Regions:
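Intrinsically disordered, low-complexity regions enriched in Ser/Pro/Gly/Gln/His and often acidic
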Residues: 2-3, 74
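Short, Lys/Arg-enriched N-terminal segments with co-localized hydrophobic residues
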Residues: 3-20
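Flexible, solvent-exposed loop/hinge segments and secondary-structure transition points
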Residues: 19-164
Length: 164
């Protein structure tokens, strides 16, 4: 019996260590934000707001450029949070909103209005394809927002899942 318990504990700790190694940390989140804003400047985008959330939907970092409008932080968080909540990039959520508005409306009610069904919310996947977080960007057109997110993630060797 003690060997079985020790084995189970060892398996748990190995899994927990693997989870921590694949978790999104502050340094990486700040790099994602920095790179996304740099891409936005290269594209001459309107002032952007970038939010990075961990896999549990918790905000790690948020940056809002000078000139970004009032609700941009909530929109960026809503794009990233929606991607995490539904397990797909917000481009697919936007398509769902067009094809199944009652469903997305119901989900948004359950989410207390936190879901933003527009491109710019991109899942962040590790090398094994597991979701480790999401980035949400807003400020320019949804296509530009999404392009900044994808480029930032790819520049760091992360897998971007925009739902395309």
């Amino acid at each position: 019996m003690p060997h079985a318990v020790i084995g189970a504990c060892g398996d748990f700790l190995f899994g927990f260590r693997r989870l921590l190694m694949n978790a999104l940390n502050l340094s990486t989140a700040v790099s994602i934000t920095h790179n996304a804003l740099a891409v936005g400047r290269e594209l001459r985008a309107a002032p952007l707001t970038v939010a990075v959330l961990d896999a549990g939907g918790h905000l790690i970092t948020l940056q809002r450029e000078d000139g970004a409008s009032l609700l941009r932080p909530q929109i960026a968080i809503g794009k990233a949070w929606g991607a995490l909540a539904l397990g797909k990039g917000s481009r697919l959520i936007a398509a769902d909103a067009q094809q199944r508005p009652a469903f997305i409306g119901a989900v948004n009610n359950l989410a207390q209005g936190s879901l933003v069904p527009a491109p710019g919310g991109v899942l962040i996947r590790d090398a094994q394809g597991q979701v480790i977080g999401a980035v949400g960007i807003t400020g320019d057109t949804s296509d530009i927002d999404e392009q900044c997110a994808v480029s930032a993630l790819e520049s760091l060797g992360l897998k971007a899942d925009a739902g395309v």
